[in-house]
């Protein structure tokens, strides 16, 4: 194997010209070698761009797609050249949402002048190979739009493409390979460019991104609006910001001046401000407009560093006196930060930032928001005056009659104007104009809420033993609504159509029975859709309140309107499934801090072929899941969180029985479920018979019942933040169900619509469906996907409604700060910042995740458990449910986790971070030791712990397809994969690991039951599994790790490893802290994530811990004391832990252990709770050695025991009230030590105290090294001078 040299391993070659000079040369050379050795090594990690997929993912293919990726169809995975386009299934990103599209200016009317070409910027040299290179641009064909790119994100342009959507002729489809390839790009002096065909003259918005064949969104979503019809190109700068002109080199602004008369004689510019060379000649001798460019004449002005603004005057030097000023007023431009060109025209007073002379204050849309108000959005309203807005505005009704504007209100920050008047006609639109901008109003959701909000019953209610169905649909803008009924045995066969009658407040109603002449006596199992006619257009829509569906196949969606969305089924859920189903009585659970949540995917849990012979029900189903529940009961978790089980879009349910045994990471009939189609109906993917709409209901009820029988609860993962397709709700009622842009168009996310939960009927949908799921299925909680996309009020209302039904219910969600809402209508979001205002719903803590194992945006970089030093106080704060990136006023606000379904598994991220190939026995063991450290820290943290399925045994999503055992070409890389390398740059054996497996096969996604349960075949995995089981038992055996309030935590939890004391650095890989349980028992947690043994000095304050029993060591954990613990030893100063070892100690209130101690066994023989496979290892399996990482390195000794806690820590401890006698004595010891230190400053800030800390050796070694270098260099120089004199 070739070893990649680091920066300090460069080979130095010297020529010794003569024997006399040899000694001097060698000495100087040696000094240089030593100098290089003294230089810190800089390692270069492989770049891992953020994966942000585009908004559009399922439209029409472009003519020149990217070269196909390696991800196969599942039919011939070993053929790496076989085509395999990605399934258009949706992706959600836990770490961070897709970049919002650029918000462009409004469409103008005036084209830019075309007075010549200009290419004055410096040419860009690309390292990418050039297929077609032209220095001058080719003309742009009619109905095409040219996109210029300064530089491509990656070197291999053939593996990158332009993914397009919105107003293009053929939006891209088949992510990621359907993009327009840069292989076909041309090149000019600016960079590369591609031409995209538009869908016609009506095209206004072009959205795009640059991706690669590995499925990475390299630029984030971008968009450009055509400011005028003739606008046909845009530029991306080096940071991929979009401009309507060619960006200039940094430090320069170009002033373009266009005169319609073509006369530039003696026209000049006088300028000042943040410019390098302000005009200083004799007035009025300005800088002449002599250079000719694309937009008239121009002057390039060098700017000062960090320039913000400059002022200028346009001059006509042929005139005299004050007439020399073309305009008497000074011009001032204040946005040099964002623009490198400005555009002037004749004597126009405006400074334009586009070459089409479109005014900055432009109307961009209009909405009818109330019976007395119309709201218009504007590009900007900075400097706008009320009288000017009134003067230039006009509103007419649908008959063309002018409507009096009685008042205007300007919202400069929100960029909107509200017109007051009599706008009581809610059936017809109004026309609003401002200067040359004119818009027809869209009916705002606010007007619909005011006029049509409805609180009655919705959906289909099956009654009278199936003989009658009561239908109610809300669609106030519909002109006509009918129900289309399909045959129960053939969902494609129409039985008949019945018109609905218009009801109150926008509803449509009908009762189906024997009088409807459909020939149906029992409607149970029949299917239906709503046919809605609106303004001459007819659509078929899915009932949003449907209780079940026909079998769904998204591959058929393009057949016709009847197949683009599912068909609802008439069912009565109350009569299905176990009749004794009730709310769960969960063991070891009273409050949310007691929960131990286990996240699982229904299909993954039973798709392992190794258990096929053991299952009596079809794999991947609700029924099969029941057969493996005892494993989770044995593990000890309180709640099972199921990835989405409600109907999702991109899947073929009719093929759910087909096992995806070949390795593939795209084009799989598999889905996580984050592309919702309906919020009441279950998917058929996990049913034993997807064709039977009642089966899925009965089987899911039975699963919940069996979970409850085992003393566990069920949490549903729900996805209200976006839908699979925007039309699912737009067809029901346009411009209502989603959050809206300022012009009234729906906002999208991940290809679907962002559900606008601030709108009354959308909030009803969310709250009603949550209530239905609790009432019908008796579930015990909800996890909200991208909860930060929602307003806090809606989530709070849903929580209260659900808790009214099930008082033990818990809610949690992703609280990332992603709220978009309705444009310019901010409100309180249900994100992490909300936690200080509520104690109802919890959020995931990315702070503990990122600090313990790394995460966005630095996933894969060393963190606490992977060798990366972290701030000890930050780690401690996270462990006591006080993350540093948001305020939690209750420990239950915080979900403590280091792994979830998103991104790499914990095992894989550890391997990536420490750069060690798990195929090597010693590396495999080390990864597991680090994994156990992470699991211990999460399970002993305050708050609510969360476990990803398989995290307990070291689940991996390594891509073990033989065709990918070594790296492949960029255009063959598996979709959603990371290529992992060791510290020398060598790829791992099977180097590809799937980080987001939502479209991968069962081979990638399966829960590996052999690794989880077979201690002979996989001892290291089963040891980790048993370790997790023991940690859960330990957590549940005491309240110490489940404190209920911040005050309790402040009183009972104390940091032992204070930074700056006893050898603990500010940033370190060790931590120790103590907890006093409410019953007086004292617990201590010590973690050594260092690669060498570390000693923890207990001093006198924590000397009582010497009498503790050990509950966790390097091999096992539990609530029972370990007789002969491994990996730790008591020393004179305290406790020493081996490398990569943690321990939990307990000092019981009565001074004795709670139970008889357990004997530590040499090989920690694990339990076999479920499945025991005694067979030999499969040929491709991972090794499972018992080897340990090298722990023979010198111990890191601490300073003497006289080093005391810092004053701040001591004071905080001394002030805390005593709860029990032992706790009081501990605090008294701390107080006494703090008194001795009372006159001293914090150790970390005092030079004298720093001298007491142990030397690491680095400082002294460097001094000696540089002294040696200097001596060698001087000796060498002396030899050379001496030789020179002799010569």
UniProtKB/Swiss-Prot annotation:
Its EC number is 3.2.1.41. Residues 1156-1203, 1228-1239 have a biased composition (Basic and acidic residues). GO terms for cellular component: cell surface; extracellular region; Gram-positive-bacterium-type cell wall. Substrate binds at residues 163-165, 175, 221, 270-272, 283, 325, 330, 674-675, 750, 816, 846, 849, 856, 903, 976, 996-998. It is found in: Secreted, Cell wall; Cell surface. Ca(2+) 2 binds at residues 835, 838-839, 889, 893. The active site is at 785 (nucleophile), 814 (proton donor). Its main location: secreted. InterPro entries: Carb-bd-like_fold, CBM41_pullulanase, Cu-Rt/internalin_Ig-like, Glyco_hydro_13_cat_dom, Glyco_hydro_13_N, Glyco_hydro_b, Glycoside_hydrolase_SF, Ig-like_fold. The record marks 902 as: Transition state stabilizer. Residues 48-61, 99-113, 122-133, 1212-1225 have a biased composition (Low complexity). CDD domains: AmyAc_Pullulanase_LD-like, CBM41_pullulanase, E_set_Pullulanase. It is an enzyme of class 3 (hydrolase). Ca(2+) 1 binds at residues 668, 670, 999. The modification Pentaglycyl murein peptidoglycan amidated threonine is found at residue 1256. It is a peptidoglycan-anchor. Residues 42-139, 1147-1255 are annotated as: Disordered. It catalyses: Hydrolysis of (1->6)-alpha-D-glucosidic linkages in pullulan, amylopectin and glycogen, and in the alpha- and beta-limit dextrins of amylopectin and glycogen. It holds the Pfam family SpuA_C. The keyword Calcium applies. Residues 79-90 have a biased composition (Polar residues). A motif (LPXTG sorting signal) lies at residues 1253-1257. Virulence factor. Involved in the degradation of glycogen of the mammalian host cells. Hydrolyzes the alpha-1,6-branchpoints of glycogen. Hydrolyzes pullulan. Does not hydrolyze dextran. Binds to mouse lung alveolar type II cells that are rich in glycogen stores. This is Pullulanase A. It comes from Streptococcus pneumoniae.
């Amino acid at each position: 194997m070739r070893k990649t040299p680091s920066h300090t391993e460069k080979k130095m070659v010297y020529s010794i010209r003569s024997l006399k000079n040899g000694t001097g040369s060698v000495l100087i050379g040696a000094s240089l070698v030593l100098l290089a050795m003294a230089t810190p090594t800089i390692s270069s990690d492989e770049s891992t761009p953020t994966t942000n997929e585009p908004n559009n993912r399922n439209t029409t293919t472009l003519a020149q797609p990217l070269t196909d990726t390696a991800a196969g169809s599942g039919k011939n995975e070993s053929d790496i050249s076989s085509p395999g386009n990605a399934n258009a299934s949706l992706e959600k990103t836990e770490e961070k949402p897709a970049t919002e599209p650029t918000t462009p200016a409004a469409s103008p009317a005036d084209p830019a002048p075309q007075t010549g070409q200009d290419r004055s910027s410096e040419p860009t040299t690309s390292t990418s190979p050039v297929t077609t290179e032209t220095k001058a641009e080719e003309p742009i064909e009619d109905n095409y739009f040219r996109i210029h790119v300064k530089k491509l994100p990656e070197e291999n342009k053939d593996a990158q493409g332009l993914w397009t959507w919105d107003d293009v002729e053929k939006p891209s489809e088949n992510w990621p390979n359907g993009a327009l390839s840069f292989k076909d790009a041309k090149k000019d002096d600016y960079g590369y460019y591609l031409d995209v065909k538009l869908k016609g003259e009506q095209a206004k918005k072009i959205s795009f991104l640059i991706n690669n064949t590995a499925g990475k969104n390299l630029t984030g979503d971008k968009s450009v609006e055509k400011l005028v019809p003739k606008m046909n190109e845009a530029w991306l700068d080096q940071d991929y910001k979009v401009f309507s002109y060619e960006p200039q080199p940094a430090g320069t602004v170009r002033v373009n001046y266009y005169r319609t008369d073509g006369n530039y004689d003696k026209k000049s510019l006088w300028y000042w401000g943040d410019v390098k060379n302000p005009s200083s000649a004799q007035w009025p001798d300005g800088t002449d407009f002599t250079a000719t460019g694309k937009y008239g004449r121009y002057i390039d002005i060098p700017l000062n560093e960090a320039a913000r603004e400059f002022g200028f005057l346009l001059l006509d030097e042929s005139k005299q006196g004050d007439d020399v000023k073309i305009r008497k007023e000074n011009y001032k431009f204040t946005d040099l930060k964002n623009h490198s060109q400005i555009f002037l025209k004749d004597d126009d007073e405006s400074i334009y930032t586009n070459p089409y002379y479109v005014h900055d204050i432009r109307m961009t849309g209009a909405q009818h928001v109330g019976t007395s108000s119309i709201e218009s959005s504007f590009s900007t309203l900075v400097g706008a005056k009320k009288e000017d807005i009134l003067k230039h505005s006009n509103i007419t009704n649908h008959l063309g009659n002018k409507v009096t504007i009685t008042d205007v209100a300007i919202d400069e920050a929100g960029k909107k104007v509200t017109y007051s008047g009599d706008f009581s006609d809610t059936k017809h639109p109004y026309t609003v104009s401002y200067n040359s901008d004119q818009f027809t109003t869209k009916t705002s959701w606010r007007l619909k809420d005011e006029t049509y909000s409805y609180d009655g019953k919705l959906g289909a209610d099956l009654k009278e033993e199936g003989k009658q169905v009561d239908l109610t649909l809300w669609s106030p803008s519909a002109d006509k609504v009918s129900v289309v009924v399909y045959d129960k045995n053939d969902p494609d066969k129409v039985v008949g159509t019945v018109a609905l009658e218009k009801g109150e407040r926008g509803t449509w109603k009908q009762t189906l029975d024997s009088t409807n002449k459909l020939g149906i006596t029992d409607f149970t199992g029949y299917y239906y859709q709503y046919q809605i006619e609106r303004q001459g257009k007819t659509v078929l829509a899915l009932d949003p309140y449907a209780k079940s569906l026909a079998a769904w196949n998204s591959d058929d969606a393009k057949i016709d309107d009847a197949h683009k969305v599912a068909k609802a089924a008439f069912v009565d859920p109350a009569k299905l499934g176990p009749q004794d189903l009730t709310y769960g009585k969960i063991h070891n659970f009273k409050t949310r801090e007691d929960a131990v949540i286990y996240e699982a995917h229904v299909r993954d849990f039973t798709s392992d072929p190794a258990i096929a012979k053991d299952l009596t029900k079809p794999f991947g189903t609700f029924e099969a899941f029941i057969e493996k529940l005892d494993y989770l009961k044995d593990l000890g978790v309180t709640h099972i969180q199921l990835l989405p089980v409600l109907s999702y879009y991109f899947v073929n349910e009719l093929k759910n029985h087909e096992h995806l045994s070949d390795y593939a990471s795209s084009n799989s009939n598999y889905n996580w479920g984050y592309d919702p189609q309906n919020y009441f109906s279950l998917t058929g993917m996990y049913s034993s018979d997807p064709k039977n709409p009642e089966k899925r209901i009965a089987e899911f009820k039975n699963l919940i019942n069996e979970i409850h029988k085992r003393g566990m609860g069920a949490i549903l993962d729900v996805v209200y933040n976006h839908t699979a397709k925007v039309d699912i709700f737009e067809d029901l009622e346009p411009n209502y169900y989603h959050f809206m842009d300022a012009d009234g168009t729906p906002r999208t996310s991940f290809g679907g619509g962002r559900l606008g939960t601030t709108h009354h009927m959308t909030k009803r949908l969310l709250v009603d469906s949550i209530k239905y799921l609790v009432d019908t299925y008796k579930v015990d909680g909800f996890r909200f996907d991208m909860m930060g996309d929602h307003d806090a009020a809606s989530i709070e209302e849903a929580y209260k409604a659900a808790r009214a039904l099930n008082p033990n219910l818990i809610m949690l969600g992703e609280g990332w700060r992603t709220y978009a809402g309705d444009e310019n209508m901010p409100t309180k979001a249900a994100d992490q910042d909300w936690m200080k205002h509520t104690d109802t719903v919890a959020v995931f803590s990315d702070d503990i995740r990122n600090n313990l194992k790394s995460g966005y945006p630095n996933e894969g970089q060393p963190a606490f458990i992977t060798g990366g030093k972290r701030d000890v106080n930050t780690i401690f704060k996270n462990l006591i449910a006080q993350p540093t990136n948001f305020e939690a006023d209750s420990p239950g606000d915080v979900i403590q986790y280091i792994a979830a379904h998103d991104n790499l598994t914990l095992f894989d991220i550890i391997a990536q971070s420490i750069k060690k190939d798990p195929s090597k026995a010693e590396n495999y063991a080390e990864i597991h030791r680090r994994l156990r450290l992470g699991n211990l820290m999460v399970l002993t943290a305050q708050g609510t712990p969360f476990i990803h399925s398989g995290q307990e045994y070291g689940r991996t999503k390594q891509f073990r397809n033989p065709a990918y055992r070594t790296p492949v070409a960029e255009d063959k890389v598996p979709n959603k994969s990371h290529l992992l390398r060791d510290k020398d740059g060598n790829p791992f054996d099977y180097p590809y690991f799937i980080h987001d497996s939502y479209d991968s096969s069962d081979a990638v996604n399966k829960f590996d039951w052999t690794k989880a349960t077979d201690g002979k075949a996989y001892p290291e995995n089963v040891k980790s599994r048993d370790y997790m089981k023991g940690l859960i038992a330990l957590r549940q055996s005491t309240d110490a790790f489940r404190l209920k309030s911040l005050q309790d935590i402040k009183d009972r939890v104390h940091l032992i490893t204070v930074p700056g004391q006893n050898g603990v650095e500010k940033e370190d890989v060790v931590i120790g802290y103590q907890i006093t349980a409410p019953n007086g028992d004292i617990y201590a947690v010590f973690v050594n994530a260092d690669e060498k043994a570390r000693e923890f000095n207990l001093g006198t304050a924590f000397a009582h811990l010497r009498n503790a029993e050990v509950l966790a060591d390097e091999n096992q954990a539990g609530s029972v004391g370990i007789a002969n613990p491994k990996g730790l030893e008591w020393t004179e100063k305290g406790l020493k832990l081996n490398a990569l070892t943690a321990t939990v100690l307990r000092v019981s209130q009565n001074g004795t252990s709670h139970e008889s101690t357990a004997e530590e066994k040499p090989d920690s023989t694990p339990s076999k709770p479920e499945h025991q496979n005694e067979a030999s290892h499969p040929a491709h399996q991972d090794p499972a050695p018992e080897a340990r990482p090298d722990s023979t390195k010198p111990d890191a000794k601490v300073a003497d025991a006289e080093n005391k806690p810092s004053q701040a820590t001591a004071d905080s401890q001394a002030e805390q009230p005593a709860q029990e006698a032992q706790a009081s004595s501990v605090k008294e010891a701390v107080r006494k030590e703090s008194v001795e230190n009372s006159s001293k400053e914090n150790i970390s800030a005092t030079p004298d105290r720093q001298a007491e800390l142990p030397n690491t050796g680095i400082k002294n070694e460097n001094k000696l090294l540089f002294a040696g270098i200097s001596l060698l260099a001087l000796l060498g120089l002396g030899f050379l001078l001496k030789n020179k004199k002799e010569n």
